[in-house]
């Protein structure tokens, strides 16, 4: 018993000495360590005024078992629900506990979190020391744990950035030092993060400023949205599937009818889920290219795209004429029809090249045709009075029964890339030039010209094309066979487009202005008749507008004259006199075809002249 008392006295003595050492040491301006002041607030309340309160380690109030349980529950509430209490469970052990007492791993982890919160609170106090002294004392006495990984950053609306838009291409063209860009972003991120973390101890203005800085970070460094984040259900809800148009390597194309507008569309759906796979970038690349290039008459029109069940779906224009590949399976095309194909495709290709983009997969399977839906309507509304004068009765009759009026369009833009920052994925080797297979991307425009030239060669009867072997090399070494069904000029043009050196191939603009594609030679009689009908219809509409404009001008003149008369009553009398005088002057002589009784100077009456 004596040994226990001496041990207790030694522990109390050590505690007293530690308290004295802390009291003698000069108080620094930094935050003091956390003190074990358990139930100290209740003890201070019970101390009468004027009496000096004793330290809780020297004299502690005697508590009953019920009060002890209430005290422990109060301490547990201050520590937080579910957190391990920093205080020992027993009052005697609590009095003997020092800061260097070993603790469990959970308490060590909680201490580290507390120290981190103390550090953040100190930084916040350094910024706002003049205005928030009370909050600093509260933070130093009872620091609050602040888990950084649970901090919720402000949610932002995000969207993809299309790399094929003119703004994106201009942004890529601006050269900028990587180190400078990294430093600016680093400074912006650090400053914004500091402001945001200290927002609890700062004013609302600082919080708003930090939030704005974080928004600037999100806007300046956009991320590509994954397909998982954009999954929506539209296919079965908005469209009714009619049949399958075609099946490719990566997707299936359906002919669908929109339930709302009743129009027919072609919806391309990927065969396999592309979200998170290696084909995700290619699917997004096709959507971006369609969104930028789908505004030309010779490019398949784009309407919308979405991700559904991790599959990519693209809503495009429905081309009722099918592909050029299906068209040349039955018969080879003649020179007249090949000129039409070349004229339409080169117009679409020239539009793509004008946007600093290249197709990189031009072939008969990716060239589609559509019938002109307005050809028969324009013939029906043609005025009857003009048919007798223009001598085009046979043309109109041929237009009524014609089904050969087609427009060729370029589709399947999955391999489209920019010439300034090319990301080339090789397409069909049967239509690619040698330099692309050798990874020479210095002249990508001419690669599309080669693909178009060999496509015309196949459509004219030069197919099927080989995938390898001597014949494959001969076609790329300038040894192009002469096709007997084509003229000499057309054979020479195809040979120039398939020249082994890219620099010697013609551009899309030079092909468009080639003499072989003149306005008269490249258009058939049916197309000329259709264009004539369209122009006459336009003239008729303009004439109707001119008549309406003349009527409006006449009404305005009458209103102006009426206003002038009402404002000037004197002018009204003058106008009346003038009208009466002019009316008298206009009155003819009263004669009925003969002069009746006209007298002369000699007073002789002349009758019956």
From Swiss-Prot:
EC numbers: 2.7.10.2
Active-site residues per Swiss-Prot or TrEMBL entry: 361 (proton acceptor)
Binding site for Mg(2+): 366, 412
A UniProt-annotated Pfam family: Pkinase
Tissue specificity note: Expressed in embryos; expression remains high in the proliferating cells of the central nervous system well after cells in the rest of the embryo have ceased dividing.
Protein kinase domain residues: 239-517
Keyword Nucleotidyltransferase recorded: no
Alphabetical list of SMART domains matching this protein: S_TKc
One example of a Gene Ontology biological process annotation: mitotic cell cycle
Free-text description of this protein's post-translational modifications in UniProt: Phosphorylated during M and G1 phases.
GO-annotated molecular function: ATP binding; cyclin-dependent protein serine/threonine kinase inhibitor activity; magnesium ion binding; non-membrane spanning protein tyrosine kinase activity; protein tyrosine kinase activity
Region annotation Disordered: where it falls in the sequence: 1-88, 147-166
InterPro entries cross-referenced by the UniProt entry: CC_SR_Kinase (IPR050339), Kinase-like_dom_sf (IPR011009), Prot_kinase_dom (IPR000719), Protein_kinase_ATP_BS (IPR017441), Wee1-like_protein_kinase (IPR017164)
Ranges of compositional bias, category Polar residues: 153-165
Protein activity control: Negatively regulated by phosphorylation in the M-phase.
Domain of life: Eukaryota
Binding-site positions, ATP: 245-253, 268
Compositional bias per record (Basic and acidic residues), positions renumbered to this chain: 1-10, 37-48
Keywords: ATP-binding, Cell cycle, Cell division, Kinase, Magnesium, Metal-binding, Mitosis, Nucleotide-binding, Nucleus, Phosphoprotein, Transferase, Tyrosine-protein kinase
Cofactor requirement: Mg(2+)
Modified residues (Phosphothreonine): 47, 165
Annotated GO CC locations: cytoplasm; nucleus
Location in or out of the cell: Nucleus
Family designation: Belongs to the protein kinase superfamily. Ser/Thr protein kinase family. WEE1 subfamily.
Function field: Acts as a negative regulator of entry into mitosis (G2 to M transition). This kinase specifically phosphorylates and inactivates cyclin B1-complexed CDC2.
Protein name: Wee1-like protein kinase
UniProt lineage: Eukaryota, Metazoa, Ecdysozoa, Arthropoda, Hexapoda
């Amino acid at each position: 018993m004596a040994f226990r008392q001496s041990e207790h006295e030694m522990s109390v003595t050590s505690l007293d000495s530690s308290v004295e050492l802390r009291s003698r040491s000069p108080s620094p301006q930094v935050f003091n360590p956390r003190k074990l002041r358990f139930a100290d607030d209740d003890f201070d309340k019970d101390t009468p005024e004027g009496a000096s309160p004793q330290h809780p380690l020297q004299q502690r109030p005697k508590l009953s078992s019920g009060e002890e349980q209430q005290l422990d529950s109060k301490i547990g509430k201050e520590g937080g629900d579910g957190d391990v209490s920093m205080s020992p469970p027993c009052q005697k052990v609590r009095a003997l506990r020092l800061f260097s007492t070993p603790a469990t791993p959970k308490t060590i982890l909680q201490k580290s979190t507390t120290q981190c919160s103390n550090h953040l609170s100190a930084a916040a106090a350094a910024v706002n020391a003049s205005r928030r002294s009370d909050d600093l004392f509260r933070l130093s006495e009872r620091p609050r744990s602040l888990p950084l990984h649970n901090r919720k950053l402000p949610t932002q609306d995000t969207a993809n950035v299309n790399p094929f838009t003119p703004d994106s291409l201009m942004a890529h063209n601006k050269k900028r030092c990587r180190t400078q860009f990294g430093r600016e972003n680093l400074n912006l991120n650090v400053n914004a993060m500091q402001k945001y973390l200290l927002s609890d101890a700062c004013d609302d203005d600082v919080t708003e400023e930090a939030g704005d800085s974080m928004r600037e970070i999100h806007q300046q460094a956009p991320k590509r949205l994954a397909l998982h984040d954009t999954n929506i259900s539209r296919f079965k809800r908005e469209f009714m599937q009619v049949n399958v148009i075609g099946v490719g390597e990566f997707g299936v194309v359906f002919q669908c009818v929109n339930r709302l507008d009743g129009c027919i569309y072609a919806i391309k759906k990927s065969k396999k889920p592309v979200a998170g796979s290696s084909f995700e970038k290619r699917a997004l690349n096709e959507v971006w290219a369609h969104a930028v290039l789908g505004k030309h008459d010779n490019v398949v029109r784009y309407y919308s795209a979405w991700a559904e069940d991790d599959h990519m779906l693209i809503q495009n224009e429905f081309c009722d004429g099918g592909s050029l590949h299906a068209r040349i399976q039955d018969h080879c095309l003649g020179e007249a029809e090949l000129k039409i194909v070349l004229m339409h495709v080169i117009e679409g290709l020239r539009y793509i090249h004008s946007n600093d983009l290249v197709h990189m997969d031009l072939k008969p399977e990716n060239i589609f045709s559509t019938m002109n839906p307005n050809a028969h309507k324009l013939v029906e509304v043609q005025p009857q009075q003009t048919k007798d004068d223009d001598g085009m009765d046979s043309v109109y009759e041929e237009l009524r029964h014609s089904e050969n009026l087609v427009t060729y369009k370029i589709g399947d833009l999955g391999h489209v890339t920019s010439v300034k920052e090319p990301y080339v994925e090789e397409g069909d080797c049967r239509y690619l030039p040698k330099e692309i297979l050798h990874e020479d991307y210095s002249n990508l425009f001419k690669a599309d010209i080669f693909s178009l030239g060999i496509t015309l060669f196949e459509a004219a009867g030069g197919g099927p094309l080989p995938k390898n072997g001597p014949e494959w090399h001969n076609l790329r070494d300038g040894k192009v066979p002469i096709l007997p069904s084509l003229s000499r000029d057309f054979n020479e043009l195809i040979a120039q487009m398939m020249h082994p050196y890219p620099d010697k191939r013609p551009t899309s603009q030079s092909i468009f202005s080639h003499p072989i594609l003149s306005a008269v030679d490249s258009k058939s009689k049916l197309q000329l008749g259709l264009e004539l009908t369209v122009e006459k219809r336009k003239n008729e509409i303009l004439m109707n507008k001119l008549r309406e404009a003349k009527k409006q001008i006449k009404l305005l003149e009458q209103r102006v004259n009426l206003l002038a008369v009402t404002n000037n009553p004197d002018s009204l009398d003058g106008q009346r006199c003038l009208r009466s005088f002019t009316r008298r002057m206009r009155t003819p002589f009263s004669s009925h075809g003969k002069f009746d009784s006209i007298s002369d100077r000699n007073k002789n009456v002349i009758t019956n002249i």
